[in-house]
Each structure stands twice: as C-alpha cells, then as structure tokens.
Amino acid sequence: MPQALAPRTAAAQLREARRQLLDRGELAPGLLPAPLLGSWRRSAGFGLAPSGRTPGAPHASSAQLARALEHQRELVAHARPVMEFLVEQTRDSDSLVILADAQGLLLQSLGDARFADRAQRVALRPGATWHEQWRGTNAIGTALADGAPVVVHGAEHYLERNGFLTCTAAPITDPGGRVLGVLDLSGDQRGQHRHTLALVRSAARTRASVWPWWPRWSPERSSTPSTRPQGSVMGAAVQVRKPLRSR
C-alpha cells in the first residue's frame, strides 16, 4: 500500500533530528517516522548538508529540456489533461502542478504565477532535477526512491531552504509497475490540505488505467528509474466535487 510521510512530524522532533544529524551525523532510533528517516539517511549518504545549497546540481539547458520534452512527448501529452484538472481543483491555493520524468527531471509545471516565482528561488522549475541525490528528501525524489506516493511537508524536507514547501507526489507507472514519471503538487506549507494526497494519488492512478499508449511503451523510448520501484500506485479513485482551497 502507498505510504506517505504523514502523520506530520512535530516541529520539536524535526529540530532535534537536524541537531543530531549536524552534530553526530546519525539519528536516534524512533525520532522520525521510518519512511522519513530512511530518506534523510539517503540524503546524508549523498553528502548533502541540510543547511547548505546543492552545488553541481544538474539543470537542463533550454535545448536539453526541449529534447527531453520531445523524448517524453507521449507522457507529456497524456499528463497535460490531468495537470489541468489538478490546477482547477487547487486554484487560489498558491500551488504548482509538476510533471517529472523517471529520473526526477522536471518537464512541465502549471499553476499559480506568484508561487512559481517563489519556487524559482529553489529551482523548482522545468529543467531542474529533483532526484534525492541533489535535493534530499522531497516529494518527487522520495516518491521515485520509494516507488510510492508521499507527502513531504515543511521542515520534513532535508534541505532547510525547501522548508517553505508542502509537496505531494505519486509515481506514474505502466501496467507492469515500471515508473514512467511523477505527478507532483507543490505549494506553500501554510496552505496544506488534508485531501491533497488522495487527489494526486487518484489522478496518477486514473491515468494509469486509461492511457492507451502504455502497452506500446518500451524502455528504449522512455527514461527508466535508477532503482526498482517497490510497487505501483494503488488506492480507490476519489471523486472531487469542489476545488480545494488553502486554509
């Protein structure tokens, strides 16, 4: 079953976890939920400093992004209606809907222009790579690493500079469980909504059941994840009657 990083980790626990990580390089057992602890440990293993930046993080040039979009044209074309649906459901909530490929490369984003400006400051924009190796614990990278939908809220992000975000992501898989990409909803952490995980998970799962091109998909035509997924997106479909609003 999908496993989110919820319930939300208390702020005091997160502060203590950061202190231990910086002072000792390790965390006491039970301080963080297991999925979050695993992601933070992976992030530390990549040599990332929680309070630092990410020098050397890859970012596609305009030409490279154009080639990636062409390479992933079927994924992009079929994801677009889902992204537009999520934008409509979350309008006025200071958020972005993001499509990434199976390596964490951000392909497209739609949503609030004001929030997009803030997101730019932490490279949450098309062309950037949000694999855990470069961004630490984050919904896109952690969903790829765990092969399951995740929520990463506020200070649960490994890098402190991403703490203003609340992000929900779900892998997009083919019928065999192979990850083709990630659908993500990112916004201001003050506007988190309790139904966001169900909405994003349902959107990714629904598209998995109806995209006619997936039987024709092959590894030679799309990027593949660096690790084997633990499972495909599961869960009952959610019928959304009203757009979500920030609290």
For the regions a language model picked out, list residue spans one by one:
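Intrinsically disordered, low-complexity terminal regulatory regions
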Residues: 1-151, 164, 173-243
